[in-house]
Each structure stands twice: as C-alpha cells, then as structure tokens.
C-alpha cells in the first residue's frame, strides 16, 4: 500500500485526525530508518559479501574471488594459525580496516606477516628516504633492504642478471631483501614501501612467494602479479596514511595484555652519542646500516641480532633464547651471503633448466660441510654439467676474512665478549646495542681488541 499524504483529505473527525497523526509519525520514522540504512549500506553489503565468500571458501569452494575487498571492519578467514583453529577473522573495533585485498585470499599468518613487514619498510623509508623492501617468514624478516643500485656480482647471486627491464630503486630493494637469505625467503611475504612498479612485479613473479603488501600498485604491475600462482597470488594494498591506536592489546590464555606501541625513532642521532670504545668513528654509511639493523630488529622475534652491509641485512638471527646463538646464527647467514660471491660458487656449471629452488639448495649444500651430498658420483650429474671442485675449508676461511665494513645491531645488550669475538669473524666493524650489562667492560675490551666502534643506544627492542 502506498500512502499519498499530500492528496489525502480526511473528514475532520477526531478518529481521522488520530489516523493522520499515526501515518505522519510512521512515515517520519521510516524515513529516519532508511537514512541510517543508506548511510551504512556499503559497509553492510561488503560485510555480507565477505561473509558469503568466506563461508563458501571454508566449505571447499576454492574458486571464490576475494579481490577488491575494501571499506570493511571485519574479514573472516578460513582458519587461524592452524587448520583446527576456527573460527578466524581480522577486525577493527573502531573504523575500517586500512587494507584492500586486490587479489587472492590471504590467511591468518599472511596478514601477520603483511602488517608486521609493512611497519618495517615504512619506517626504513622514513629513516633513510629511500624505497625499502622486506621478505618475511613466520612473523620475522628473512631480509630487509633499501634501494641502492646492484653491482653485477649482486645481480648474479640474486638471479636478476637476466632481467630485461631496467631495475628501479624499489626493484633493487626487493632483490636485496629477497636475495640475502634465499633459503629462508622461500615462500615469503613481501613488503614494499612504495608503489609496486613493473620491474619489481617482474622480479616477484619469478619467485616462490605467498603475497605482497604495498601502498599501491601500477595497473601493469598488478596485472603481472594477478597472473602469479594461477591467479591466486595474495596482493594487499594498505593505506599509507593509517596510524594505529597508540595503545595496543593482545590476548594470551584469555588474559588481555595492554601496552603502548613501540614508537621509538631509531634514526635519532642521539643514539650514536654514547661511544665507550676507543674507536669512535662511525662513517655515514655505517650509521645508515646500523639504523637499518635496528629497525629490522624492532620487527624481529626476540632475541635477535642483525648483520647489515651496503644498505641490506645479510644475516638475521631471530627467536633464540641465547644471545650468542643469535650472533652465531646471523653470522653464519652473513658468511653464506658472502661465500655466494666466491668465484667458485658464481661459476658453478649448473645444468640447463635447473629450477631456482634447486639451484638455491645446491649452492647452500655446496658451501656447507656437507658438500659431498651434491658432489658424490651419481648425484652431481643431477645438478651440474661437470663435477665442480670442492670449496675447501681453507678457501672459505680466506674468503670470509676479506669481508669488511659490516654493521651489527642487537635488540638488547651483549652479556659477554664472546658475541664480539663471533661478530669479528664475519667482518663486523660497527656495533649498536643497548648496553647495560654487568659485563659491559668485557664487551668494550673485546671491541677495542679488534678496533670495533660500538655505540650504547640505551634502547631495548624486544619484539614478541
């Protein structure tokens, strides 16, 4: 029934006057309700759309398209960290999610990696003024870098020497972040500080990866990424202007933890004013690399140590209970990065058509003490055209000894000088750490023994 109140002329009776008042009141309330409905129409439609897609995906429909999901407070996920952890979602208590899913269907861990890695590259860009990239696995970086140009050697060991497009600064940052620890970066989540361009998308498409987050994507770059993984590659766009609440919360075993966000600025010159070592000289490049190291550690599971050289992390030791184990783990990764530049490694005669992952694995074994696993008769023919010579222990030690100018950051103080002894073996000449150990004197003496310049920042960077 449609009521035309303008044409209605009821008899002037008390009963009809009550009817008229009822219709006017009902019509006014309905208009108010419709206005509120229209105000939230987009959000309601999107949430219903997401719920339908999520339920269909959870019920086994793998052809559900999650692209162009935006303007929402909540996104239901297939499951949490593990398939048995249901239900799962990400949501905002206030406002809308600062992301858009442009392609794919990211999962719980994908979003953890995406949001942690985005903070890292955003902060690197703000601190250095250069495009930055990170490669994340299990909520810690495997690599992080800024967009310095690549030498021919780095292009070769990062497997980008055959790319036909000119590498942009962002593409160089990505190649460095992905290439530093290729074994750990396998199946990573990528973060980019700047709009993803064709050159960067071209490099990403070649690697085994779960997804990428960036403030934007050129149409051509987005099309390249949409073709990856048979159209299921996860592409997330984030609002670069988004600022989270300064107070953050998390739950453990039903108990809610609350703390202020870690918003310490790590490009503050004051961080390098307390230098207790005899060598007090930090070059501009060393300060830049130490800043990169500290920012990387800020988003790495503790305990953590990070070796940096020429604008990129070359060894990250994450999540170890012992500080010396962090230093050893990260140092070993830095040594492998450096050994990959040895002439014997760069000239390995791989068979034609070897897959990138197989090449990575073969190099890793060839460099290690288990080199016979790829060099024994009946095995080497699977990887090489001819049997390579062994890279001897003496050759490896001599090559590693040539590495110089490495910067090292730690997310907390070094308790003993053994960390410095190990760092020195991997070419460390500059260190930034919190200080405050009862054995600071031992740590300082060990630095002086090798002429290492060390700054006490007074800042702890635990991340859990």
Where do the PLM segments sit?
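Short, positively charged and aromatic/hydrophobic N-terminal segments
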Residues: 4, 25-28, 32, 39, ...
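Glycine- and Gly-Pro-enriched alpha-helical subdomains that act as flexible
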Residues: 142-182, 314-413
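C-terminal binding/interaction regions
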Residues: 192-193, 206-227, 231-234, 242, ...
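Active-site-proximal loop/turn and secondary-structure-junction residues that shape catalytic pockets
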Residues: 140, 196, 309-312, 320, ...
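Acidic, Ala/Val/Gly-enriched low-complexity intrinsically disordered segments
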Residues: 6-7, 12-14, 21-24, 45
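Gly-rich Lys/Arg/Thr-decorated short loops/hinges at beta-loop-alpha junctions or inter-strand turns
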Residues: 93-105, 180-186, 260-280, 357-379, ...
């Amino acid at each position: 029934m449609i009521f035309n109140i303008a044409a209605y002329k009821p008899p002037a009776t008390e009963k009809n006057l009550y009817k008229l008042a009822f219709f006017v009141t009902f019509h006014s309330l309905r208009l108010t309700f419709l206005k509120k409905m229209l105000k939230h129409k987009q959000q309601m439609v999107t949430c219903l759309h997401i719920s339908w897609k999520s339920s269909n995906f959870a019920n086994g429909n793998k052809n559900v398209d999650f692209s162009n999901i935006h303007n929402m407070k909540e996104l239901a996920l297939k499951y949490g960290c593990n398939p048995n952890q249901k239900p799962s979602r990400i949501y905002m208590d206030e406002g809308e999610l600062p992301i858009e899913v442009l392609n794919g269907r990211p999962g719980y861990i994908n979003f953890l990696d995406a949001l942690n890695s985005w903070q890292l590259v955003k902060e690197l860009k703000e601190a250095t003024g250069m495009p930055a990239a990170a490669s994340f696995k299990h909520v810690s970086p495997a690599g992080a870098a800024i967009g310095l140009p690549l030498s021919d050697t780095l292009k070769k060991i990062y497997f980008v020497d055959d790319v036909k497009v000119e590498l942009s600064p962002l593409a160089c940052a990505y190649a460095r972040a992905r290439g530093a620890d290729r074994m750990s970066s396998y199946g990573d989540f990528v973060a980019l500080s700047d709009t993803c361009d064709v050159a960067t998308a071209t490099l990403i498409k070649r690697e085994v990866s779960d997804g990428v987050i960036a403030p934007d994507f050129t149409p051509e770059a987005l099309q390249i990424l949409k073709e990856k993984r048979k159209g299921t590659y996860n592409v997330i766009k984030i609002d670069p202007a988004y600022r989270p609440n300064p107070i953050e919360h998390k739950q453990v075993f039903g108990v809610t933890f609350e703390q202020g966000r870690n918003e310490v600025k790590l490009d503050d010159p004051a961080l390098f004013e307390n230098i207790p070592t005899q060598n007090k000289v930090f070059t501009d490049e060393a300060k830049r690399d130490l800043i990169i190291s500290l920012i990387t550690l800020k988003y790495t599971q503790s305990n953590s140590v990070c070796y940096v050289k020429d604008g990129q992390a070359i060894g990250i030791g994450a999540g170890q209970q012992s500080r010396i184990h962090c230093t050893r783990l990260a140092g070993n990764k830095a040594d492998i990065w450096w050994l990959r530049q040895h002439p014997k490694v760069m000239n390995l005669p791989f068979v034609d058509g070897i897959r990138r992952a197989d090449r990575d694995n073969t190099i890793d074994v060839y460099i290690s003490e288990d080199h016979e696993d790829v060099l024994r008769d009946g095995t080497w023919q699977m990887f090489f055209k001819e049997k390579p010579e062994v890279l001897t222990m003496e050759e490896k030690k001599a090559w590693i000894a040539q590495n110089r100018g490495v910067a090292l950051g730690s997310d907390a103080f070094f308790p003993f000088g053994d960390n410095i002894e190990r760092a020195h073996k991997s070419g460390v000449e500059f260190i930034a750490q919190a200080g405050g150990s009862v054995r600071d004197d031992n740590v300082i003496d060990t630095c002086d023994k090798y002429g290492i310049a060390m700054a006490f920042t007074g800042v702890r960077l635990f991340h859990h």
